[in-house]
UniProtKB/Swiss-Prot annotation:
It is an enzyme of class 4 (lyase). The gene is SRN. This enzyme hydrolyzes both single- and double-stranded RNA. This is Seminal ribonuclease. The keyword ATP-binding does not apply. It comes from the Eukaryota. InterPro entries: RNaseA, RNaseA-like_dom_sf, RNaseA_AS, RNaseA_domain.
Length: 103
C-alpha cells in the first residue's frame, strides 16, 4: 500500500487516524503488513491453519513478512486514541474467502 514503517514511534497513531480506523472508538489491535499485495494474496495458497475463532479458512505465510503491530495503550481513551508501535518480521496468518480466495 506504499506505506512503510519508519523510525517514527507515531506510525500507528498516524496510519490508524489517516485510514479512519479510530472513528467512534479506539481500535485495540491492528497489524500493517509491509509487503506487496501479490505476496499477501499468495498466503491464501500456503499452509492452512486453524483460525482463532474456530473457522477453517486461515492460512499462514511460508516466510516471514515485515509488519508493524499496533496495540492500544492502557491509558488510551477515545477520541485521543494512542498505540504502541512495534516493528517485526513474522509469519502472518490471514483469513481467506470468496471465489478467488482473497485475504
Amino acid at each position: 500500500s506504499g506505506s512503510s514503517p519508519s523510525s517514527n514511534s507515531n506510525y500507528c497513531n498516524l496510519m490508524m487516524f489517516c485510514r479512519k480506523m479510530t472513528q467512534g472508538k479506539c481500535k485495540l489491535v491492528n497489524t500493517f503488513v509491509h509487503e506487496s499485495l501479490a505476496d499477501v494474496k499468495a498466503v491464501c495458497s500456503q499452509k492452512k491453519v486453524a483460525c482463532k475463532n474456530g473457522q477453517t479458512n486461515c492460512y499462514q505465510s511460508n516466510s516471514a513478512m515485515r509488519i508493524t503491530d499496533c496495540r492500544q495503550t492502557g491509558s488510551s481513551k477515545y477520541p485521543n486514541c494512542t498505540c504502541k508501535t512495534t516493528r517485526a518480521e513474522k509469519h502472518i496468518i490471514v483469513a481467506c474467502e470468496g471465489k478467488x480466495f482473497m485475504p
